[in-house]
């Protein structure tokens, strides 16, 4: 089902830099979007298109490298075990394998992270030259810098949308934000699917279907590029290429609706912590990525602006409007985010340990 893009508003975020009336209009639009879908597009965001294209080009080159080369920078080689490269099948979303490969990076530089056997998180300058991925590290960090600035601006607009001081979230949570950025590659499995269907046909009684329904193969679990989930932190700002594949849960039913790429925009969504802080007034909505059978590889770049790891996310105080919108005690994943009372770092490590069980330490729920 294709979405009517009027339902996911396209907000001109540049207006937030104008007068108070324009700021209030942006805040009003964000309020409506966060209550209804938890998703919205932004345009005129100020991130140079050339930077986006440069990043997209260099990550395409990186993912085209042989697997054994990409594994030089695999996850688990630093004390931030979730940073680095992972191959198809290693990321798990709520018990189901995701059909993608990717890398996760943060704002931390190599010198800020303890490495194992002196293996750097990023390719060295010599390796960038050797594997023809020049500018890989520098382009990533320039993008992180620009997206951090943009995301802080969006968080200010979200503050105003809740009738809070513009710097409310900055003072309490994003003064030292936890930044995570993904470079995601969804290979096209179009030809593989065709081959599997042909093999199935040939294996059924010499190419003939069995007349007995009981002998037919049981239906397989539906595959996804990324399974249904909600994001964990405050805000996600996503760049997706023109292949598309993102789907968002409808506000009117249990169905999912397409959230297609729109040139010149990012798509934003709020996470569990903002849902928790607003008592369910703002929605951390389910979304997923379709299994890629398009015949073209898909690339996306999610950027996560999350609370400081040492901060303790709390319900916004003295905000009576929120109580009437409280979430149900249990969500779709049988979790109650409103009962969680630890630091964001504890919440994150618990979540990431389920997504990458092969890599993440389980040391009393603490970041190490």
Swiss-Prot record:
E.C. number: 1.14.17.4
Binding site residues for Fe cation: 229, 231, 287
InterPro entries: DIOX_N, IPNS-like_FE2OG_OXY, IPNS-like_sf, Iron_ascorbate_oxido_reductase, Oxoglu/Fe-dep_dioxygenase_dom
Domain Fe2OG dioxygenase: 177-307
Cofactor: Fe(2+)
Null allele phenotype: Show reduced level of ethylene production, suppressed zyg1 expression thus resulting in inhibition of zygote formation and impaired macrocyst formation.
Name used for this protein in its record: 1-aminocyclopropane-1-carboxylate oxidase
Originating species: Dictyostelium mucoroides
């Amino acid at each position: 089902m294709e979405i009517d893009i009027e339902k996911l508003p396209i907000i001109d975020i540049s207006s937030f830099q104008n007068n108070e009336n324009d700021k209030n209009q942006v805040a009003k639009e964000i309020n409506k979007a966060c209550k209804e879908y938890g998703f919205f597009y932004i345009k005129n965001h100020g991130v140079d298109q050339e930077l986006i294209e440069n990043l997209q080009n260099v990550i395409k080159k990186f993912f085209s490298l042989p697997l054994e080369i990409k594994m030089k920078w695999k996850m688990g080689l630093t004390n931030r075990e979730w940073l680095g490269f992972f191959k198809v099948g290693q990321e798990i979303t709520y018990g189901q394998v995701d059909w993608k490969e990717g890398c996760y990076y943060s704002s931390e530089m190599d010198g800020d992270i303890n490495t194992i056997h002196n293996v750097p998180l990023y390719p060295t300058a010599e390796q960038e030259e050797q594997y023809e991925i020049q500018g890989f590290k520098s382009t990533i960090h320039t993008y992180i810098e620009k997206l951090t600035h943009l995301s802080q601006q969006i968080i200010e607009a979200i503050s105003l949308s809740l009738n809070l001081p513009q710097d409310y979230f900055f003072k309490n949570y994003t003064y030292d934000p936890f930044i995570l950025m993904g470079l995601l590659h969804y290979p096209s499995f179009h030809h593989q699917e065709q081959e599997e269907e042909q093999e199935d046909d040939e294996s059924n009684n010499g190419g003939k279907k069995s007349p007995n329904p009981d002998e037919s193969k049981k239906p397989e679990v539906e595959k996804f590029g990324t399974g249904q989930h909600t994001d964990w932190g405050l805000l996600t700002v996503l760049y997706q290429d023109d292949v598309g594949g993102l789907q968002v849960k409808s506000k009117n039913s249990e169905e999912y609706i397409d959230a297609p790429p729109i040139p010149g925009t990012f798509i934003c969504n709020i996470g569990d912590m903002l849902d928790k802080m607003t008592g369910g007034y703002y929605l951390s909505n389910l979304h997923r990525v379709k299994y890629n059978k398009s015949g073209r590889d898909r690339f996306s770049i999610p950027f996560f602006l999350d609370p400081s790891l040492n901060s303790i996310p709390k319900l916004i105080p003295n905000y009576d409007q929120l109580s009437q919108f409280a979430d149900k005690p249990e969500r779709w994943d049988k979790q109650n985010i409103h009962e969680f009372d630890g630091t964001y770092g504890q919440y994150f490590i618990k979540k990431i340990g389920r997504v990458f069980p092969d890599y993440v330490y389980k040391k009393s729920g603490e970041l190490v």
